[in-house]
């Protein structure tokens, strides 16, 4: 314990006085003293700075290279040169410093004073350190609060009892307030011997630690006074008040806990105390004073306690904790005080707050010249439960604080040692630093708290890598022949230190989890390509197993940790080219078998001798056979059957695969063949005898094989690694296929080889059953019920593609070819736009600077369809789709049905042999599934109507299904139904029935996309041609014209041209006499045709001219000849005026219809139509004369005003021109001024200047209308 945080102080007892028989020394590495569970404790503070390579963790744990080797008992006092012993008064000294150094044990000098110049005690060096065994390691108890270690050493300062005087050593004072240490005197009555350090101690001594041991039990006299002077003291005095060990608190203070009954004359004086805590265990009185000038106090009554606090400065706090007293008087004063005051408060009121250390009463020292007294009165009787709870809470709090500090200190030390080990070179061994660090770590393993699993694994990994990565001892000796002997000794010492560390870590946590954290890091090293690394790993594993067998502290109910991996790796080493490694590996397996057997016998409550059991098992497993080690492997696998569960079988197989990695690179040909043989024997025997136990771990085995194949390059080794697939598939094909479906997509070479292994190697599975499983997977939706994407269908398609690459499988695939084809086509539709979970397989052949191609599921599915067609001999069909772009159409959402139709049409054209099977298979499919399923099936089914065999199908399955499709809510189903009916109409016996359905077919085209309308109308033309003039009801034609007219303005050129062309052909089908419906429909077509002619698209314009001629011919219109001209109207104002005058004069009843259509086209998204409509409006309105109303004129005004700000400049100019024409016509015809209309101005005001240009007509503003239009257009562009 320390007087301040960071001090390194141990209190030693005086050998000449009455020693305490229960004192407990600090156990050292070579200490012969066994610690006993007594309250006497060795004290050391937590570290605050980084430790050196060999830090002064603890006087007993610090290897001292300069000290004399050999065990030292702490019970023997140190002597000086003259042989004088320490006097009755001992001394406690602490001085803080910011540096570290070596720790020495201070002995008394000739004058009887302990000083740093004394001869240091003998401490064992690091080279002679022994690992602490469980029998001699210290254990924490309720009073033990100092199990931590420290590397901090302290310098010495002069005593200064007067607070007003300056410090003689300013440097030490500047270190920290808590580092200023006063003199500590323990004196007897009548014999006051001060134990002070020399005042002239230099700063060089700051690097040495002074350790002395004092026992307060040296005062048998009842009148003895104990005086302690310190800057910060935390004293805890319990029921027994004489022999007290001292411990550091959580804040670097001192706790004193008495161990025997108090004497009647005991006086305790504490001066310069900042924190005082007293916990009496009985009602016996205690008196505690803190004053620099007050003499020894007398014993107070049991009902009261007096505490006088004297601070060194006005800012220092004084706090205390007292229990089991009825009256508490507190006084805090300073010398030269001018005012004193006393305060009293009952303790019972604050007992609830005293449940933690937060309840400590703190007195702030008043300024100089003032004093304050406080009296606290407590009830005579206190509740015993409250007292017990208070004491328990305080002890618990102190323990928690100490545990936290110890944990942090241990973690910091472990990390520092690990860094030191990591800094050691991996190619040479010239320093004992690595060994010393591991020895320190081994010693730390005996302290609490224990390391976590993650920390232990990290520690073992660091140490193992640092030692195992070293070259062989022969190589290191050859590199430095002059130090060959030293290197050899240091090498074996390092290996021994590592093994002791591993054993110590197991002792620290002797549980299955703790054993697993040690064995796991060792495992991969047994498969190293270097013999010396394998030998070290095998030796360490065997040593840990041997230590486990000797200790065996636990009963493994869930099986030995990592049994499968450990057994598998040791089995591989039996076949190692180095016979010594094989022999030691077999011995390790024998120990492992003995452990398992012993656990089994212990569970059955059978008494067994470990040594005899080991010898019997050694004979039972047989001697090592270097000629044929595979015999040993087979024997071991057979005998371990009772201990192998599913997890162990999995680990055995994966361990066998580990032995196949890197054979060609790291080992010779013979060695590689031996390892392959050992792995193959292991795999074959385990799968032959225990494959039924691997059923539940098949997915994990498949995943392990996939991962290991990436590291196995040698062809023969890859064949061995793939053996478990064919073995397991022969018995559990469904489970194996399901596991293979989880391989990352797209399949790389490893995944593809695993699929092909199902049928390439014996024993192989039934291909028929395998294909049926894949077909079942292909029928699943790639989206689960919860909306999550599933890779199962795509994985099944990928597996099918790999199986098709095996020629022997093609014949079996033909059996279910129709089902596979339809299932794949439906999956193509499902995978359009589908984002699957990211399970991309890393491409080992891809370069770092090249991005792998983006994996799009639908394209991969289309590729599988193409592969299936080619394997089934449909190369012509595949080429046809390639030419027509059918594969691209098939992978798009809006055109998927077109790609499927192209494929079916090609198969019909090239007379595919499987069409009849597909036709009969499709009939039930039309009633199943969702919309995508039905669309794909219907698209294929409709094209099969071209076959002659369709006549055999009942009419309800052909014509009936198509009639139902006409009323389907999906437009694509409507189009497909129309196509099916048109194809059926080619059959003479079906023509009449299909023609009767023409009105329903036309009606189904309403509200349909333009492209679908064009496609459907293209099919309907066949019926119109075949019908001729037989159709007497013109309503069908009129309805067709109504459906086509809205698509005249479609954004797609092909749709516009097709609809306009069909419109003209339908008009030709019309017969006289004209009905009102016909006239209204054709009249509503006039303006659109005139505007579209001005579009500027030659192809569309030509279709419009033809259609306009057809309409004019049927309606007897006499339009001006230039109305059919495609020349722009920009410079043809007279032509537009003639057309408008003709329309007003000849179609007076429809003039407002024409105006409304013009205003509607003025809002069209295409600029060409807006410009044509504006030009037409500018000529039509003046021709209407008095027909215009105010409401209509305002509507025209608003439309033109908006168009003056159109993004298209030509539209702005045309809008301004139209305004000028309309205004000029109004003034010329002397239109009356409309009320409240500022747009039409008085002609008389046109010749006067008005500052408000906004109210003037456009033609009378200072700028011309062209400039105004251009300015408006520019403003609109800026916006």
From Swiss-Prot:
Superkingdom, natural source: Eukaryota
GO annotations of cellular component type: membrane
Spans through the membrane: 548-568, 722-742
Positions with biased composition (Polar residues): 71-106, 124-140
Residue numbers bearing the Phosphoserine modification: 356
Protein keywords: Glycoprotein, Membrane, Phosphoprotein, Repeat, Transmembrane, Transmembrane helix
Protein name, entry field: Maestro heat-like repeat-containing protein family member 7
Organism: Mus musculus (Mouse)
Recorded name of the encoding gene: Mroh7
